[in-house]
Amino acid sequence: NNEKLTILSLWATWCVPCIKELDAINEVYEYWKEDIDFELIAVSVDDSRSHRRAQALVNGKEWPYKILLDVNQDFKRALGTSFIPQTLIIKNGKILYQHTGYQPGDENYLFEKLTEYEN
């Protein structure tokens, strides 16, 4: 659904800030869903040697997000990004917001942006 807000989060099992960001969002995810209709897709950029670790990590974390694997990093290259975590908000096929890195509290700003772009 192109009109639905989508958060795309590029991450990897070896990226500590990535895991922290997805854990932080997980803590507030249900509250966010009560206020805003959005989808979160976490795209693992783990390569073919480590993608099994991504699946195991996701199963252990029980993240409610849709998880995709970008084993060849084609999607990451198409976005033109070299760094993770990379978080984007997309609506109607357009990137409305993009952020690289994670500091505790960044998820609050992400929620503000979701609220801003909701309408």
Predicted feature locations:
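Proteins that catalyze or organize thiol-disulfide redox chemistry
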Residues: E3, N26, Y31, Y109-N119
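Structural microenvironment flanking redox-active thiols in thiol-disulfide oxidoreductases
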Residues: K20-K61, N72-R77
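Short active-site neighborhood of thiol/selenol oxidoreductases, capturing the structured segment around
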Residues: N1-I19, I25
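Proline-centered helix-kink/hinge sites
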Residues: P17, D23-E27, K66, P85
